[in-house]
Amino acid sequence: MVSTISRHDQNKNNDYLNQPSKEGRFGKYGGQYVPETLMPALFELEKAASDAWKDKQFVDELNHLLKTYVGRETPLYEAKRLTEHYQTKTCTSRIWLKREDLNHTGAHKINNALGQALLAIRMGKERIIAETGAGQHGVATATVCARFGLKCIIYMGAEDIKRQSLNVFRMKLLGAEVKVVTSGTATLKDATSEAIRDWVSNVETTHYILGSVAGPHPFPMIVRDFHAVIGEEAKKQCVESFGSLPDILLACVGGGSNAMGLFHPFVKEKSVRLIGVEAAGSGVNTDKHAATITKGSVGILHGSMSLLLQDKNGQVQEAHSISAGLDYPGVGPEHSYLKDIGRAEYGSVTDTEALNALKLVSELEGIIPALETAHAFAWLEKLCPTLEKNTEIVINCSGRGDKDVNTVASSLDI
């Protein structure tokens, strides 16, 4: 495994990777738009993370647990039948899957949950809170809290609880208390708002394990850095598998943690295209989508400035996606920055396109991806016809689809 601490040493000499600024900004995005009562906790967290990365004992423990508990490194798998499906005379691309679905708990989320739990212990916090949409971050957080004997409270929207009943049971089985959020749209945005309110009230004893590269600084940086192991492994595995860096990286984007984990170690590699895929829901020209980068404008949500879905009066609009994990009206500030400087590209696919992709990948590869991940797979329909010969594509297979079986069963005629 690539040592996490080496990544921080390398970052010092690279303008792209030397983000965020000391003020927690990615260009104009990011920052700390929070009540004064939270500022000491954010400063404490930033210092704890900075000190931890310099502490060999912390890094060694993290890497040991990633290997023996999480099951890293995850494979880079050549999807041969999916490759054959998209090959034509003009497109001879190969498709590779970074198998984050094979992690303990079934998704990439545990990379960050584990790292932040170790930080919480380092700071002397015994109570952990988290938000969750699809339930995967909630399960990952409940899992690491069980591992370390920490009290765990998970906030989840009532609508998402209906869609993800299996993950709700898993969280409870792991000893977590699941608090139902009924305000607003009763989805991820509202669960996040409730978690922040809890943190404001209990900041002395509680650490908030935020699940995406969103929120106030230093969360976007911390979550990114714990997930960067995805891209670090992929970079090494690509060289081993086909002798070079990939041509294209592809990942779904809601808040954006799995994509940033894959993208970050490649940002300075200008030959590698970075493509994020958002949820178009019923279509980006309807009022039922979650395509924040595609259709959003600059605003402030959950303590950070970024692109978000809002009306002409600056009120945050409802997001919609068949995927609970992409059903969020904001996006991480670093994604907004990468889009602005032209380093990353972003597109969107509809619910129907994602469902069709999930079915296709399941039938061709024997891998049932999460609905979130299926959005990245669906982009192949638009991407592959535009490519030159011998293009190497790496898709972040960010999670498995067990949690989505009920939703898929009610939507697909199988």
Curated annotation (Swiss-Prot):
<feature type="region of interest" description="Disordered">
    <location>
        <begin position="1"/>
        <end position="23"/>
    </location>
</feature>
<dbReference type="InterPro" id="IPR006653">
    <property type="entry name" value="Trp_synth_b_CS"/>
</dbReference>
<keyword id="KW-0028">Amino-acid biosynthesis</keyword>
<keyword id="KW-0663">Pyridoxal phosphate</keyword>
<dbReference type="Pfam" id="PF00291">
    <property type="entry name" value="PALP"/>
</dbReference>
<comment type="pathway">
    <text>Amino-acid biosynthesis; L-tryptophan biosynthesis; L-tryptophan from chorismate: step 5/5.</text>
</comment>
<feature type="modified residue" description="N6-(pyridoxal phosphate)lysine">
    <location>
        <position position="109"/>
    </location>
</feature>
<comment type="subunit">
    <text>Tetramer of two alpha and two beta chains.</text>
</comment>
<protein>
    <recommendedName>
        <fullName>Tryptophan synthase beta chain</fullName>
        <ecNumber>4.2.1.20</ecNumber>
    </recommendedName>
</protein>
<keyword id="KW-0822">Tryptophan biosynthesis</keyword>
<dbReference type="InterPro" id="IPR023026">
    <property type="entry name" value="Trp_synth_beta/beta-like"/>
</dbReference>
<keyword id="KW-0057">Aromatic amino acid biosynthesis</keyword>
<dbReference type="GO" id="GO:0004834">
    <property type="term" value="F:tryptophan synthase activity"/>
</dbReference>
<feature type="compositionally biased region" description="Basic and acidic residues">
    <location>
        <begin position="1"/>
        <end position="12"/>
    </location>
</feature>
<keyword id="KW-0456">Lyase</keyword>
<comment type="function">
    <text>The beta subunit is responsible for the synthesis of L-tryptophan from indole and L-serine.</text>
</comment>
<dbReference type="InterPro" id="IPR036052">
    <property type="entry name" value="TrpB-like_PALP_sf"/>
</dbReference>
<dbReference type="GO" id="GO:0005737">
    <property type="term" value="C:cytoplasm"/>
</dbReference>
<comment type="similarity">
    <text>Belongs to the TrpB family.</text>
</comment>
<dbReference type="InterPro" id="IPR006654">
    <property type="entry name" value="Trp_synth_beta"/>
</dbReference>
<dbReference type="InterPro" id="IPR001926">
    <property type="entry name" value="TrpB-like_PALP"/>
</dbReference>
